[in-house]
Amino acid sequence: MCIRDRADPLILIFLSSALFLGWSLGANDAANVFGTAVGSRMVSFTKAAFICGIFVILGAVVSGAGAAQTLGKLGSINAIGGSFMAALAAGLTVYWMTRLGLPVSTTQAIIGSIMGWNFFSDSYTDLSSLFKILSPWILCPVLSAVIASVIFALARKFLRVIRIGLIRLDGYTRLALILSGAFGAYSLGANNIANVMGVFVPVSPFQAMRLTDDLLISSAQLLFLIGGLAIAIGVFTYSKRVMMTVGSELMRLTPLA
């Protein structure tokens, strides 16, 4: 990993706020992916954390650039100090919610931090980008509810028709939970790494790395790799409480549900 010669060593210290935000995100948002599986005792926490950590990192590095571009249009934080404060404010908010065992959107936290920076620095806020970010907050829960209802109805009807034995059904259910959790973890990394490292992309201290003639890792991807590792550590060290809240305390769920 190459650091730019012109980079101030303080930049690496400022990045600590993004690492803290990444850790907080992993501690809180992993419940969205594996909370139901762990809460229903179908997948152990250790296995869920390992799978989630691996696929979060992959999603962040491979597919994280698109979300970062959208977030960057909301408001340009072109000062490293501003990036540090925005990430720190979001990280503290998410950590506080996690301490209470409450699931919280990291996207909402970082958007609020960026808006606060724009207000403090008298910077322009792109309202079209803000609307683009806010609209899924309304559409996503509704769409998820509809899709979940359809999938649950189809799965229940399918199981009645094929009449699988309980032991085989248990095995298939565990496998389905693991596969869906891995996909969810990949999406979590791809969509949320912008919340962790997006404000630091314009001031990245890293140079692009060429591993082979055909494989180049960009400066942003190096940031996303570090952020993905921070998220994975948060999953391993502090996510179990929120997982149990989502998986068993909010509503008692069957393994199929």
Listing of model-derived features with the role each one plays in the protein:
Residues L134-N191:
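Core mid-bundle transmembrane helix pairs that form the ion/substrate translocation pathway
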Residues R41-G53, F84, S128-L130, M209-S218, ...:
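Membrane-interface alpha-helices at helix entry/exit sites of multi-pass transporters
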Residues M1-I3:
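Short, small-residue-biased leader/transition segments that mark boundaries at the very start
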Residues D5-P9, K73-G82, L130-L139, I167-R168, ...:
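Interfacial loop-to-helix junctions that mark the boundaries of transmembrane helices
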Residues F14-S24, A48-A60, G64, M85-T93, ...:
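Alpha-helical transmembrane segments in multi-pass membrane proteins
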Residues A31-V38, A90-L102, A155-I162, V235-L250:
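C-terminal ends of transmembrane helices
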Residues F183-A257:
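Transmembrane helical segments that form the transport core of multi-pass membrane transport proteins
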Residues A27-F34, M42, L100-G112, A190-V201, ...:
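Short, non-helical or kinked segments that cap or interrupt transmembrane helices
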